[in-house]
Amino acid sequence: AHLGVCVANAIYAITCPGTAARAAGETTSWFIDFGMRNFFQNAELGISNALSGVVYHRELVFFVLCAALFFGVWSKYRTWIYRLLGLFPVTCVFLLGVLDQPLTQMIPKLSFFVNGLTDKGTVTVVTAWSLKRYLPFLLLCAVFAVCIIDLYLALGHTVQAWMAGVVLCGGFASRAMLGFSPTVWQSGDRTAFFFLMGCLFVTLCVWQTLSDAPKRFRLGLIALVGVCAVSTTLSLIGA
């Protein structure tokens, strides 16, 4: 019954005349070209907006999630292909996100990934015919897809794994769907909160599985969280 009420409310919110009037006003105020975009352009913008902020920028909550998945996979598997899958997201996020500024100063060509997102998306009408321009978007998709695979590997074929996957994908979708709204650049911070809360929940789920893992994996994750906490505190106080 509760689900039915939610669905009915969503249908009403989408179809009521006030929604169309508000969308027209927001398009004029925030995204004048929004009405000229197609489904695929909006989907690409939403995905790029949701993931660029956590992969190509210094978002420690998502980095800790990737690190937890790394420890979770490496504590359970010795097969090299599984370990490579566990290593891929945390490496990408560490190099392109956590170390974005110092690394791009050392290797300027990496700024192609970090600065790939524009206000029209990663792939625009102007750059659509350049295969190189698709690389930042494809890397974002690959990182998130491998995170889902790592989550399944770390938690196993369990109900908890499916629940954690739904929470993570739901948090991601709550921000990616803004690609279909003219306020995509004004409402991003609010919806990012739900995505990051989903990341924290999934991190806790993976942490529980490390209780049976060798002690070095738990200590490694604790040390990493401590370093991230100190780093965040220092940045907040301007040290």
Q: Positions of the model-derived regions?
A:
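Transmembrane catalytic cores of multi-pass membrane glycosyltransferases
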Residues: A1-A154, A161-G165, G171-R190, S235-A239
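Hydrophobic alpha-helical segments
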Residues: G179, M197-L204, T209, A213, ...
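Residues within membrane-spanning alpha-helices of integral membrane proteins
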Residues: L3, A164, L168, C199-V202, ...
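Transmembrane alpha-helical segments
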Residues: I222-A239
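Polar low-complexity intrinsically disordered regions
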Residues: L3-V7, I11, D212-R216, A223
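Alpha-helical transmembrane segments of multi-pass membrane proteins
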Residues: C141-A145, F193-L204
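Membrane-interface junctions at the ends of membrane-embedded or membrane-associated helices
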Residues: S75-K76, I148-A161, T203-I222
